Amino acid sequence: MGLMNAFDSQTEDSSPAIGRNLRSRPLARKKLSEMVEEELEQMIRRREFGEGEQLPSERELMAFFNVGRPSVREALAALKRKGLVQINNGERARVSRPSADTIIGELSGMAKDFLSHPGGIAHFEQLRLFFESSLVRYAAEHATDEQIDLLAKALEINSQSLDNNAAFIRSDVDFHRVLAEIPGNPIFMAIHVALLDWLIAARPTVADQALHEHNNVSYQQHIAIVDAIRRHDPDEADRALQSHLNSVSATWHAFGQSTNKKK
């Protein structure tokens, strides 16, 4: 296949500088595992191996690409992270279709890095506001009685968790998850789950007592959201949702400032 020669280094010591500040230097050679990964990925995308079909064994891949076992295993692990193969102990890798969760998961590291920069949290909170605003309007216009009942059940669990902060956070996430499920789009679900995971992970540690009032306020705001959806009033549902998320954002911003002052 010519894989081994795909990125031969060609250092030309006499090559001119590029611009005023860049000196000539050889391009870094790709690792063998990366080259194997790219070749296998192209074969999968060309449907040379169909969904559900097993790839050749590690030994066969080693011989085919003329590389060692570590390179093959690293390549397969990278394909697994991309959702292109599944690997079970004792079995050959099997071709799979990337899920929405896998696609969003690939962005997780970059998202967490972005959140750590100044303004990062505010940008993600704005993204959540725009995203959930569309979800709640859709819910008010299209939610079935069964879906509204699921929201009501999530709200009931919310009310039962007011005095337990860890349980309330879980019930809060579940309430918004039920809302995100209403359109029936798996990509929406993956984005929503990731957004909340990233934002919650970036929140400061706060004493339990300080959270009790916040929990009660959030619960009352959830009631307003469900009431508007039940009445099939998208404008009121949107106002209730935006009021809720803006309140949550302001509260956690205040918690963060208080935490920083104590350091």
From Swiss-Prot:
Task: Tell me where in this chain the HTH gntR-type domain is found.
Answer: 30-98
Q: Which InterPro entries match?
A: GntR_C (IPR011711), TF_FadR/GntR_C (IPR008920), Tscrpt_reg_HTH_GntR (IPR000524), Tscrpt_reg_NanR (IPR023730), WH-like_DNA-bd_sf (IPR036388), WH_DNA-bd_sf (IPR036390)
User: An example of a Gene Ontology BP annotation on this entry?
Assistant: negative regulation of DNA-templated transcription
Q: Which cysteines are joined by disulfide bonds?
A: none
Q: What domain of life does the UniProt record list for this protein's source? A: Bacteria
Tell me which residues form the DNA-binding region: 58-77
The Swiss-Prot or TrEMBL record annotates one GO molecular function as: DNA binding
User: Keyword Transcription on this protein?
Assistant: yes
One Pfam family from the UniProt entry?
Answer: GntR
Query: What ranges does the record give for the region Disordered, renumbered to this chain?
Result: 1-22
Record's CDD domains? WHTH_GntR
Q: Which UniProt keywords apply?
A: DNA-binding, Repressor, Transcription, Transcription regulation
- On whether Lipid metabolism is a keyword of this UniProt record, the answer is no
HAMAP family, A to Z: HTH_NanR
Q: Give the protein family.
A: Belongs to the NanR family.
The name this protein carries in UniProt is HTH-type transcriptional repressor NanR
Give the species this sequence originates from.
Escherichia coli O17:K52:H18 (strain UMN026 / ExPEC)
Underlying gene: nanR
